[in-house]
Curated annotation (Swiss-Prot):
Cleavable signal peptide: 1-21
Keyword Signal carried by entry: yes
Organism from which the protein derives: Terebra subulata
Organism classification: Eukaryota, Metazoa, Spiralia, Lophotrochozoa, Mollusca
Tissue: Expressed by the venom duct.
Domain comment in the entry: The cysteine framework is VI/VII (C-C-CC-C-C).
Name of the featured protein: Teretoxin Tsu6.16
């Protein structure tokens, strides 16, 4: 039991030493990288599949008779109105 207690103390001290030196752990590095990549991917996909549908931006394949159709196309219509108002 004493050996495991000493080992635990050594591990805690080593963790504090590395933290004070500024070494980043895997958990601290990955979320920011993953977040940035997912935001870029989402932006690219949204931009890539927007088409002009009678003056209204719709997702690709949503344009029918100069109006947006299918689920989610109304959201793109609202975004295009907000952008045109600016």
């Amino acid at each position: 039991m004493a050996t495991s207690g000493r080992l635990l103390c050594v591990c805690l001290v080593m963790g504090l030493v590395f933290e004070s030196l500024g070494y980043l752990t895997g958990r601290e590095k990955r979320p920011a990288e993953n977040l940035e990549a997912s935001v870029q991917r989402r932006w690219y996909l949204n931009r890539r599949y927007e088409v002009d549908c009678g003056g209204v931006l719709c997702q690709f394949g949503c344009c029918e008779d100069d109006r947006c159709r299918e689920l989610g196309c109304e959201f793109m219509d609202v975004l295009s109105r907000i952008r045109s108002a600016e």
